[in-house]
Curated annotation (Swiss-Prot):
The keyword RNA-binding does not apply. Gene3D superfamilies: 1.10.286.10, 3.30.1130.10. The gene is folE. InterPro entries: GTP-CH-I_C/QueF, GTP-CH-I_N, GTP_CycHdrlase_I, GTP_CycHdrlase_I_CS, GTP_CycHdrlase_I_dom. It comes from Vibrio parahaemolyticus serotype O3:K6 (strain RIMD 2210633). GO terms for biological process: one-carbon metabolic process; tetrahydrobiopterin biosynthetic process; tetrahydrofolate biosynthetic process. GO terms for cellular component: cytoplasm. It catalyses: GTP + H2O = 7,8-dihydroneopterin 3'-triphosphate + formate + H(+). The lineage of its organism: Bacteria, Pseudomonadati, Pseudomonadota, Gammaproteobacteria, Vibrionales. This is GTP cyclohydrolase 1.
C-alpha cells in the first residue's frame, strides 16, 4: 500500500479486518492501461449488440465509458483517490451530536452495473477528535464511487469514520432507489431501500438513536 495516505491505509486495513472491503483483486495495470483495455472490450460488447460504432454518435462511446469507469464512477476502487482528511483535536470540548444529512449518494449496483441514487445521513458524537464537515461528504462519495451493495456501503462509511475519529459513536443511514429494481426486473419505480449502521452509543442508547433518526424527518 505504498503511496497511500495514512488515512487511506488505516481505513482499508480496518475494512479488511472486518470483512467489509469490496471484493477486489490487486493488479499492476496502470490507469491508462485500464482505460485502453476497457475501451477495447467495450467496443467488442457494443459491436456484438449490433451497434454501428462508425456512427458519429457512437464512435467515441467505448472511450467515454472507459474514462467514466476509471476516472469517475469506479474511482473509489483506488485508495490513492481516498480524500485528504482533516481530523483535529476537540479543543472546544464539543459533546453534542454532529449530524450531516441529505448527502447525495450516486453509486452503481455491483450485480447489474446500473445506478443507485439516494441520500445519506451521518452523525457522530465528538470525543477526542472532530472532523471537517466536508470530509464526511467526501468519504460518502468515495465509497459510492465503486460497484456496491447498499448494505456494505453503509457499513464501510461507518467503519471509515469510526477509524478516523477513533470512536465507535457513529451512525449512518442511506435511503436509495435502485435502478436494477426500477428499470429492469420487477420495474418498481417508487420503492426505496433504507439501510442503517449504528455504532457505540447510537446502538446502545435508545434515546441517542431516536435523536439521530428523528432529526432525519
Amino acid at each position: 500500500m505504498s503511496g497511500l495516505s495514512e488515512s487511506a491505509k488505516l481505513v482499508k486495513e480496518a475494512l479488511e479486518q472486518r470483512g467489509l472491503e469490496t471484493p477486489m483483486r490487486p493488479n499492476a495495470v496502470s490507469r491508462e492501461e485500464k482505460k485502453e483495455k476497457i475501451e477495447h472490450h467495450m467496443r467488442e460488447i457494443l459491436t456484438l449488440l449490433q451497434l454501428d460504432l462508425t456512427d458519429d454518435s457512437l464512435e467515441e462511446t467505448p472511450h467515454r465509458i472507459a474514462k467514466m469507469y476509471v476516472d469517475e464512477i469506479f474511482s473509489g476502487l483506488d485508495y490513492s483517490n481516498f480524500p485528504k482528511i482533516t481530523v483535529i483535536e476537540n479543543k472546544m470540548n464539543v459533546s453534542e451530536m454532529v449530524r450531516v444529512k441529505d448527502i447525495t449518494v450516486t453509486s452503481t449496483c455491483e450485480h447489474h452495473l446500473v445506478t443507485i441514487d439516494g441520500k445519506a445521513a451521518v452523525a457522530y458524537i465528538p470525543r477526542g477528535k472532530i472532523i471537517g464537515l466536508s470530509k464526511i461528504n467526501r468519504i460518502v462519495r468515495f465509497f459510492a464511487q465503486r460497484p456496491q451493495v447498499q448494505e456494505r456501503m453503509t457499513q464501510q462509511i461507518l467503519v471509515a469514520l469510526q477509524t478516523l475519529l477513533e470512536s465507535d459513536d457513529v451512525a449512518v443511514t442511506i435511503d436509495a432507489t435502485h435502478y436494477c429494481v426500477k428499470s429492469r426486473g420487477v420495474m418498481d419505480a417508487t420503492s426505496e431501500t433504507t439501510t442503517t449502521a449504528l455504532g457505540g452509543i447510537f446502538k446502545s442508547n435508545p434515546a441517542t438513536r431516536a435523536e439521530f433518526l428523528h432529526g432525519l424527518r
